[in-house]
Amino acid sequence: MTEPAVRCTELSHSFGTTRAVDGVDLEISPGEVFGLLGPNGAGKTTTLRMITTLLPAAAGHITVFGVDVARRRMAVRRLIGYVPQQLSADGALTGRENVALFARLFDVPRASRDAEVRRALDLVGLADEADRVAKGYSGGMIRRLELAQALVSSPRLLILDEPTIGLDPVARSAVWERITQIRTDTGMTVLVTTHYMDEAEQYCDRVALMHTGRIRALGTPADLETDLGPGSTLDDVFRVVTGDRLETDEGGIRSVRAARRTARRLG
């Protein structure tokens, strides 16, 4: 039997008296693009932080490709590439220097480091812009640079927290085209959070919809829409489950920073 890429069992975490994640059970299959959806404060980012070992689970159990997150944190980290909400690229460095920095942090062997940096930049379509200073990049290019930083260690699981928040539709599409191509070329598993239902419908194999710390709906976008009724969209499913609507924000690099700050505050 194939081991799940991610398995969460009765996963919970609280901040003071607030239960951010409340008994989450979840399995993600190797090679799939899995979307974790929900409004601000639903528990999405908290769940990702527990999977990535950045936050200990108060209760429950997590494995990544069969490796116990609580007992073998460093082994789990070697399996994961993570792009958080907060900007991780240094605007004073070139694209190549940014990715090389992450190669050193991930202990990519010195003998192959330059080649791995070139490979990661090529995967995200930045090979021709690699020697430009990152502060001159557009918002979409910054996001692709962050993807390269996460990919330089050849992870088996790529975790993306709101990867297109604050970008205009063209830049959003460009980022997703790269994510999709990377999954096709490498077989990598992708776990992503997003506020954009159209992205989840188009690019995710399955989605889980979180609200108040719990998973309220789980399945393929098509199945969830069919279950709701003829003509339904994933946004309709969201509104039924949460009684709310997602707000979007589009723009350049300043919008990216502002949107990420808001999402990080609200969870």
Residue ranges and their predicted role:
Residues 158-162:
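Catalytic Walker B motif of ABC-type/P-loop ATPase nucleotide-binding domains
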Residues 100, 104, 111-129:
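Conserved ABC ATPase "signature" region
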Residues 133-140:
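Conserved ABC ATPase signature
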Residues 218-219:
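ABC ATPase "signature
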Residues 173-186:
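Helical segment within the ABC ATPase nucleotide-binding domain
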Residues 154:
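Conserved catalytic motifs of ABC-family nucleotide-binding domains
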